[in-house]
Amino acid sequence: MPPEAPRRGDPSRVLLDHAYLLHRRDYRETSLLLELFTLRHGRIGVIAKGARRGRQGFAAVLQPFVPLLVSWSGRGELANLNHAEAAGIGVRLQHTALFCGFYLNELLMRLLPPHDPCPELFGTYRGGLETLAAGEDLETALRSFELSLLEAIGYGLQLRVEAESGEAIRPERLYSYRIDAGPVPAGDEADAVHGMTLLALRDRRFDTSQTRTEAKRLMRRIIAHHLNGRALKSRELFRSSS
């Protein structure tokens, strides 16, 4: 049965937005609580009433990493999911790539404010899943998504010039990255990274093991700062499985 068309002039009803499921959990006896990342409305929370009994007919497609078309109604923090259908074939993530996918989902839930449309980030997320599924370059997929997410929430990194002098970043120089300002020439800081790593982050190309290692360490510190010390369950799950 096709989804019910929205009533004219009713802003509380949304018809067929592209989406991905970020998280689901059981609610009461028959329903599901869902976190969705949508193309036109950003991250939203919805309730799928009766979905666990199969009354809605779309519970089977509500799986992570499956492109969806969803319709919902209602105002406030929790809307009612009226319709969901697969908009394509979901990517198949295995082993390390699966934990990377969970990591992307958790970052969206923790850092992206609700109801904040980010169509470019949506495209980056979709492309990141495809890269993870292909097993081509997990590190580049993760760093690219982290950078795009920080830009989307207003905390993009300064990766072109030194924060204090305004001079171009030098590949051979060591820098300490100040989260509230940008890169400054480093002294004996333990978290210093080479300028070539900052430029690799700017270009989203990591051609050496050094740039990969330093970029991962720097981004982990910056992400941890914006998480305010909250641990990521996806990382804990990966460690426990290793």
UniProtKB/Swiss-Prot annotation:
The keyword DNA damage applies. Signal peptide: none annotated. GO terms for biological process: DNA recombination; double-strand break repair. Transmembrane segments: none annotated. The keyword DNA damage applies. Pfam families: RecO_C, RecO_N. Belongs to the RecO family. Involved in DNA repair and RecF pathway recombination. This is DNA repair protein RecO. The gene is recO.
